[in-house]
Amino acid sequence: MADTPSVAVQAPPGYGKTELFHLPLIALASKGDVEYVSFLFVPYTVLLANCMIRLGRCGCLNVAPVRNFIEEGCDGVTDLYVGIYDDLASTNFTDRIAAWENIVECTFRTNNVKLGYLIVDELHNFETEVYRQSQFGGITNLDFDAFEKAIFLSGTAPEAVADAALQRIGLTGLAKKSMDINELKRSEDLSRGLSSYPTRMFNLIKEKSKVPLGTNATTTASTNVRTSATTTASINVRTSATTTASINVRTSATTTESTNSNTNATTTESTNSSTNATTTASTNSSTNATTTESTNASAKEDANKDGNAEDNRFHPVTDINKEPYKRKGSQMVLLERKKLKAQFPNTSENMNVLQFLGFRSDEIKHLFLYGIDIYFCPEGVFTQYGLCKGCQKMFELCVCWAGQKVSYRRMAWEALAVERMLRNDEEYKEYLEDIEPYHGDPVGYLKFFSVKRREIYSQIQRNYAWYLAITRRRETISVLDSTRGKQGSQVFRMSGRQIKELYYKVWSNLRESKTEVLQYFLNWDEKKCQEEWEAKDDTVFVEALEKVGVFQRLRSMTSAGLQGPQYVKLQFSRHHRQLRSRYELSLGMHLRDQLALGVTPSKVPHWTAFLSMLIGLFYNKTFRQKLEYLLEQISEVWLLPHWLDLANVEVLAADNTRVPLYMLMVAVHKELDSDDVPDGRFDIILLCRDSSREVGE
């Protein structure tokens, strides 16, 4: 099987089909120079959980759902993704596999992350489950050649069914004759990939060997494991026994001629029960065994064999009777806790402050507050140490309650972010000064915030109606609908192809000159930072930016100073997983379109450089004012996650072709500081005069 790129195996249940791929996957995972990512697909959702637990139980494999891969991309940690047939047939999955090499290079900056095995269980379902065949159509779009090996398993599929099932998902089918692997390697088919190979069938049901199932009965002089049977010379495992004048302490017992250690006991004439055994003058109970002159000290005591137990009893320190310490709050604290629990009843769930305000789940999805944590808050605001982490009170005055998943402090962080959504930089700075009495009291701030609950809800609905309409794809931005844009910018008269060409030209110039990306898009400063372009992972990338002082300049020059000192830096590590996944997926679709047109694929920026660009544009006040003036369908957004989400919507260019908004942003940014685009300069006086206008004026 090692020389066969595609195999189908038919074997009865219990024969060991799982180990057929489990052991090779462990071997792949143990390779240090290359990281392999494999995929297993089962027919039904009910099989997922048990399958993941079984394969990940030994700790040799990191196992995760395929949904994580589809939504977020490869995380660089998981060895095996497990999903169902619907995942295998989904467009997002096939697109990610098609663009695997490009995505890996952009994400991990290395080619040492490869696709390993594709395993499909219960292969016969592709042919026999006629009512689901329409759902399997997308599997034919999968690039099987990208995988190192494909394994198809079934317990019931004869060769005819297996052959039809393989052809239904786009493969050649079963081999019609025995294959000489040496001849196969010499053939021209070898260059066409796995999908052109006929699949070799291993029918283990025809084998005459028998596999014993279950447990065997016990005989004289046998060892009984997890069963209840004893003989004259038998050894009972997982039980404890005592005999005349013997002492049983937890799991060990002694007899006249034998010694039982840890979990084994031997007796001359013993009777085995579920947990304990007693002899001639003994009594069997569920946990303790006693004899005629013995005492079983299950509570960490030793018994005296000659009956004088009191003088020889040993009392360890842990046996001193002590009432467990319990914090006893005052009646005022208990009353406060009850009031807060009534006011915020859903903190036992994964609740956020938008849910508390009354927004629907579909609205929360786009008004998301991911990346809002302690680092979002300025220094000194809800960041005190040495106090309760949940409510920032002294421990004896803590008002948190058992089972609380969302702490009051976390809700206060999110409430502060909601207030930021509604205020520009100057207004937010004043707001932070107004709430100074609550800087060390998130619970008090939540009470203050909840008083304006309805007012805040209405404000968000008014101010972000345009944002929800665009991000929920209910409205599409068209540059031709922006009168000011058509009159004031050449970019708004470009075709979609021209905008894309300009976007790739900008990135090509940045790459050649090794320009620091974030600083360039922040203020058009073309400082060099070669370490940034040579960085192999996110950590090295951030260290390169920190070394040249990018984050310090950003905090001193822009509104980034209104957040914690680590806030921008952490955007490159643990936040924006969904956006990263969407961006990587767009690379795959872009690559596929270029290959279909016969065009040489363009070099696209990797994720960290792309995120640097969007962060630089977000904090570039001059650019933001110009874009909002020219593009009349959008208004201000004051949270970085909202800006990133907005930048990834599609807009209609002058020729009605779709381009991502971030490409249009880069073109406008280039127009502000370049002679490459005619009429590139913009009237700053006019911009400042109209920067305070309302959308729609």
From Swiss-Prot:
Residues 251-298 have a biased composition (Low complexity). Residues 246-321 are annotated as: Disordered. One of its GO terms (cellular component) is membrane. The chain crosses the membrane at residues 65-85, 106-126, 131-151, 163-183, 194-214, 227-247, 286-306, 316-336, 361-381, 394-414, 419-439, 450-470, 487-507, 558-578. Signal peptide: none annotated. Keywords: Membrane, Transmembrane, Transmembrane helix. Its main location: membrane. This is Uncharacterized protein YHL050C. Residues 299-321 have a biased composition (Basic and acidic residues).
